[in-house]
């Protein structure tokens, strides 16, 4: 079979890379499309996964609408040219529309409940929708639910063995530390959510924590000069989960 994966976020590279490897072992032809978001392409390069780029929109509505149209048309051509049988994605409007037009089977695997609510119209167009058992609402009557979460695609004990956290953090063993995560809050599914900490609150949080332990910051955004020294420095192919595992 000819199978397509589409990623729109770096985490989705981790979600699907092991599935891709297993499918290749079974002699399937596997393709990959991605939007150039954050370090997604860097991860694909590190894992030596060939890919082609989709267009990335700007933040304004007109740009998003234009990019949606361009990507749908581009994917229609891609699906037909490569005779794709099945597309596997998280919630992805481009692929959903293109697959429906081309008659390609489309599987959506989603784990972000508030995002899934917003994108329910696209879930209804897919052939199969797979979500965690913990979802509080029903996307569709024939949805498939699983016990667990998508992080187990790459963090299951049969797939993941953490490195030594002390080597990754370049610190003494048994050092008490905290990992603080700051996100952009600019994703389409974050638009109706409270926007996290203010800059002053971030500074206060770090100041309070560092009285008791060493502080590392994982941030999607630029940090002010006084917080930048706290930014965690680990290779991009090392998961933040590696420093959350007890050594």
Could you describe each region identified by the protein language model?
Residues 10-24:
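Short amphipathic alpha-helix
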Residues 71-79, 221-247:
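Donor nucleotide-activated moiety binding/catalytic core segment of transferases
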Residues 87-98, 108, 236-247:
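A donor-sugar binding/catalytic signature common to diverse glycosyltransferases
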Residues 107-109, 119-131:
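A conserved, positively charged/aromatic
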Residues 130-197:
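A nucleotide-sugar donor-handling region in carbohydrate enzymes
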């Amino acid at each position: 079979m000819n199978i397509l994966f589409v990623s729109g976020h770096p985490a989705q590279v981790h979600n699907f890379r092991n599935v891709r490897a297993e499918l290749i072992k079974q002699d399937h032809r596997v393709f990959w499309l991605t939007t150039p978001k954050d370090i997604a392409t860097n991860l694909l390069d590190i894992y030596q996964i060939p890919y082609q780029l989709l267009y990335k929109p700007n933040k304004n509505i007109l740009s998003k609408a234009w990019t949606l149209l361009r990507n749908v048309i581009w994917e229609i051509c891609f699906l037909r040219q490569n005779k794709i049988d099945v597309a596997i994605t998280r919630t992805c409007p481009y692929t959903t529309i293109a697959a429906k037009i081309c008659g390609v089977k489309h599987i959506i695997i989603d784990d972000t409940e508030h995002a899934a609510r917003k994108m329910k119209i696209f879930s209804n167009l897919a052939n199969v929708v797979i979500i965690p058992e913990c979802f509080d609402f029903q996307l569709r009557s024939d949805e498939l639910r699983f016990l667990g979460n998508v992080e187990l695609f790459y963090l299951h004990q049969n797939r993941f063995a953490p490195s030594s956290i002390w080597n990754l953090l370049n610190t003494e063993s048994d050092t008490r530390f905290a990992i603080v995560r700051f996100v952009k809050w600019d994703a389409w599914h974050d638009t109706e959510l409270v926007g996290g900490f203010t800059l002053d609150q971030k500074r206060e949080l770090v100041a309070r924590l560092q009285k008791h332990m060493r502080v590392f910051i994982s941030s999607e955004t630029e940090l002010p000069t006084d917080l930048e020294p706290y930014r965690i420095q680990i290779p991009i192919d090392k998961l933040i989960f590696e420093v959350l595992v007890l050594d």
